[in-house]
Amino acid sequence: MVINVTTIYSMENMNIKGKSLFLAGPIPRDENAISWKKEAIDILEKYEFSGTVLIPEKRVFVAKSNYMEEVDWDLKALSSCDLIVFWIPRKKPYMLGLTSNVEFGYYINKKNILYGRPDDADEIAYLDWLYKKDTGETPFNNLEDLLVESIRILK
């Protein structure tokens, strides 16, 4: 099997190859929190996604960074991608996803998006309601199913 997933992390040059998706959702704010994005990349590789994955976090955890520069990178990546995939495994206090809430509301009617969250995620009722209201779809509750649908859409 040849893996054709190109990963571009925050602040890296955006050399997008093929179809692209942006992994939107909480990022670790503490080195003890585990990022869900590694699992997402593994799933995309398992299903042989051929394209670029834009990941709005550093390859290696950095406690302090230039937030506004990263936000600028995020906005460029969000506007450049073919699909925004929101996965909101919100868990207090380390995986809040507050910026993700704003991005979700901003892009829900502007770009192609998919949305999901685990059934035990904290405080996601409003996102669920808005997604159902604006798309007519039910949120995914399984990361693998969400990403398989992403691949299908981008083919």
PLM regions: where:
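Conserved catalytic or regulatory cores that recognize and/or transform ribose-phosphate-containing ligands
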Residues: 1-155
